[in-house]
Amino acid sequence: MIFMVKGALIKFSSYEDSINKLLTLLKVSNELKKYDKIILKPYIADTNNYTPVEFLESVLKFCIANKNPVAEVFIAEGSDSSDTTDLFESIGYNSLTEKYSIGLLDLNNTEVEEITDSEFLKFSSIKYPKILLESCVISLPVLMEHSETEIVDSLSNMLGAYPSQHYSGFFSSNKNKIRKWPMKYSIHDILICKLPNFAVIDASKQGHIIAGLPIEIDKTAAKLLGKDWRSIQHLKLAHDSFSSRLIKKQENEDPKIKITE
């Protein structure tokens, strides 16, 4: 097992064993107990490219076993170009809701809150799923290369939070309105609305599972694909932006020491 500053990477043995060890080590249960809603956000492109059911189920079982007694758990995604509920059925996610009595949410058709933020780089405002704002959001991508976002990681996975009812074109089910500029900006602005609380990346094809805080573990994920994270446009932009936000926050929160003679 390899430790990172804000996460860890473990050699893949099986989904259940690797994920249990990793999440226990990182004491994720302590964070889960703070929330009344937990959202598992898998990646679904189509019926050939998606977060595996076995991977999702292992994270789900850990969350159910370690959540506070009243907390609800949901699986949520907003597919781009396809009907999300049909994909849930085709992939097999529906079986998890029946087995564990949890909810499935289509983020393309859910209640939204309009968010404005001076740190948005392209959008003037974003209609963001309200339930994500109220929940512990865990991003669960499967690591792979991607033609639009270069790689699929915990950050780019959050493109699913753009509801298609507000971001698709008139004659298309694709979320065309997030493609008016380079994708790195749409990823950045959706993360300004809310950065996932935590992420677990299925890098089993590369021999590992990675877990920890988004941005930091995505850098490790990029390395597993033989890439320098600085070359991944959305990851470099997020690193620079959120580092700057953290510095500003610390400057505002740190007590000022006044020296008198």
Placement of each model-derived feature along the sequence:
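Extended, low-polarity segments enriched in aliphatic/aromatic residues
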Residues: 2-39, 45-78, 82-261
